[in-house]
Amino acid sequence: MMKTVLLLVVLVGVAYCDDDGWDMGNFFQQYHQWQQQISSSSSSSSSSGGGGSSGGGASGGGGGGGSSGGGGASGGGGGGSSGGGGLTKVVLKAGGGGRGGGGIVKSVGGGGGGVTKLVAAGGASGGGSVSGGGGGGLALLAGGSAAGGGRSGVVTVSKQPIIINRQVTHVNTGGSGGGVGGGFGGGRGGFGYGLYGGHHHYNPCGYGQVYSYYYGCQSIYKQPARQVYHQPIYQPVQTVYQPVQYYQQPYQYQHSYGQASHAYQPQTTKYISYSYPQYSSQGSYPIVAGGSAGGFASARSGGFGLSSGGIGGHSSYPLSVFKHAKGEKYKL
């Protein structure tokens, strides 16, 4: 049975993976057929996956309800750990209820190579922590729930920036060893991270610049993490005209009558407005990690480890969250 599953995985991978891009419509259509076949043939291949979802094994699972965060710390499931080659798609479902609406969902690594796709269906208010990547050649970003609760979307492959909770990240299409880490749906807003050959690949503005939802790409100065970056944004200068002064301008000829003329004196007072966008410290720490796990678990292979139970590891410059203070006027 496992040989049949692996053969089907290889065939799907060969049919739907190429060098230029993915045909995600045909991929998901084929995947649903593949999932039905596997779920009917491997329901007894392993124990129940987590808190009430049978299937397990190559069919994914690791979910179900529960009072301690649904998926709990076990999470994961099936096909991704076998790796091999070709295409492996794993669906991680974090059950509702409990801590964070989904508990801690551990990632399922890609193993040897090929393609690993992680799709996370998070719960309310956080949806747990989902990460991906392993040693596979390509791993897709898995998004957690939004900060306000609700379901998370399925993040697909793209070479363009993807907006996640008003923050920009990239889905990596290469890289050795690390692949792409997953997305997080934390209690205070999601954020994404990834590796591309060991380098940052989540900032669409380039080195030395940061993306702002309000101002676009802004230059920053490289400073230690969790600092407030004061980058003055100069507003157009406003010219204020004073009241017009009137005076008589007599003609040169003695018998001519005088004529009043209006002379506009541009006695100006210039005001310049400074606006200080501030880096928010709530839920927007770009994390560099290169392991098969991550988030609230600990990274296993390479990169920077993430501390258990919170946000840690190696922080870099801010990603996209700004608090722009009210502009104050200064008289020149």
UniProtKB/Swiss-Prot annotation:
Subcellular location: Secreted
Origin superkingdom: Eukaryota
Tissue expression as described in the entry: Prismatic layer of shell (at protein level). Expressed primarily in the mantle with highest level in the mantle edge and lower level in the mantle pallium.
Region listing for Disordered, in residue ranges: 39-81
Residue spans of biased composition, Gly residues class: 48-81
Signal peptide positions (record): 1-17
GO cellular component: extracellular region
Keywords: Secreted, Signal
Record bears the keyword Secreted: yes
Protein name, per record: Serine, glycine, tyrosine and glutamine-rich protein
